[in-house]
């Protein structure tokens, strides 16, 4: 599978997201502007009343993504401030999904994350 096959809109569902972050999000993946075999994109979350709160201080409703698809592993870094990595995504293609479903874990690495921030399971599903 090539990174280009992941270009498009994805629905994100988190299992047990941390306080203040929603259980659902949208992700747009595209070709990276500098590295044609890599991915870039945006993850969009509705932070609602939690936006700007201490619990999610390190996150924005829209965060930039950059990463790679490496031998079936999806590896993305997330940045809410365009400077530091505020989250990491590590996922694998679900067998039999033809590259349309990935499951893995998201990790909060923002300044507001606790030292022992848990890995948060996610499922990405490609939208038509």
Regions found by a protein language model. Give the residues of each.
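Central antiparallel beta-sheet cores of small beta-barrel/beta-sandwich binding domains
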Residues: 1-128
């Amino acid at each position: 599978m090539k990174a280009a096959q992941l270009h498009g809109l994805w629905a994100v569902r988190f299992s047990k997201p941390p306080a203040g972050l929603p259980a659902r999000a949208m992700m747009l993946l595209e070709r990276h502007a500098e590295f044609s075999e890599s991915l870039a994109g945006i993850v969009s979350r509705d932070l609602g009343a939690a936006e700007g709160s201490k619990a999610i201080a390190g996150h924005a409703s829209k965060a930039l993504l950059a990463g790679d698809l490496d031998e079936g592993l999806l590896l993305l870094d997330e940045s809410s401030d365009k400077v530091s990595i505020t989250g990491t995504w590590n996922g694998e293609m679900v067998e039999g999904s033809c590259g349309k479903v990935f499951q893995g874990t998201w990790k909060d690495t923002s300044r507001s994350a606790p030292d022992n921030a848990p890995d948060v399971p996610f499922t990405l599903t490609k939208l038509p």
